[in-house]
Amino acid sequence: MPERLQARSTTQEQMDTACADFAEYARCLRDLTRVNIVTRTHAPVLAWLRRHAPADAAFSVCDIGCGEGDLLRAIRRRFPSARLTGVDRHPWSIRAAREATPASAQVDYVEADLFALTGRDWDFIVSSQFAHHLTDEELVRFIQWQDAHAVRGWFIADLHRHWLSYYGFPLLARAMRWHRLVREDGAVSIARSFRTKEWRALLARAGVSGAQMRWHVPFRLCIARQCARS
């Protein structure tokens, strides 16, 4: 592995601060949705939910770091009776999600810092490509927060830090003509992501046992846990 990928990077992604206006930010989010389609990003989350809930069940799901809401719309298509909440602390993300989601989908989008969400529980808490945005300390706290607020279980889908995806994603992004910030931030996000050993250490720091870790194509590490209240 290249030396620059031996340890997790602390370089910050540009998108949250470098977009000139909402229109550019929304374009980046639309391209990220395209990335998720091309790389089948949401498949592990959807498969996990199918294993734990009937398609017609009226369970609740909270998506942390929901972005444009494409994961929640995918969940809605498969689980028409689910009660869906999307949380993101960036106001432009919430605005873009509301604009991209038809009213008939009935998704509750909330602009908030997740740690400020007190007094609310959900059957399932999910996040997709969110964990690598956090520091190690924040991620430990996030794991503990999920354990406190998920009734039936939680699922983290994130990137796997690997040289092939690190060097390959910019080529894919250029070929697909995705926004420059998406192309550049993609490599940064991969460098900020985790390897199996690091996830084990973070779970231990959080005091969480019984979590399952699985690798998914292409270069995704997913962490799932069924909660004691289920």
Where would I find each of the regions flagged by the language model?
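A conserved beta-strand element that flanks and buttresses the S-adenosyl-L-methionine
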Residues: 126
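Class I SAM-dependent methyltransferase Rossmann-like catalytic core
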Residues: 22-44, 52
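Class I SAM-dependent methyltransferase SAM/SAH-binding core
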Residues: 62, 70-114
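Conserved glycine-rich SAM-binding loop
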Residues: 67
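N-terminal, positively charged/glycine-rich alpha-helical extensions of SAM-dependent methyltransferases
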Residues: 1-29
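Conserved beta-strand signature within the Rossmann-like core of class I S-adenosyl-L-methionine
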Residues: 151-159
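C-terminal alpha-helical "lid/dimerization" subdomain adjacent to the S-adenosyl-L-methionine
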Residues: 159-203, 212
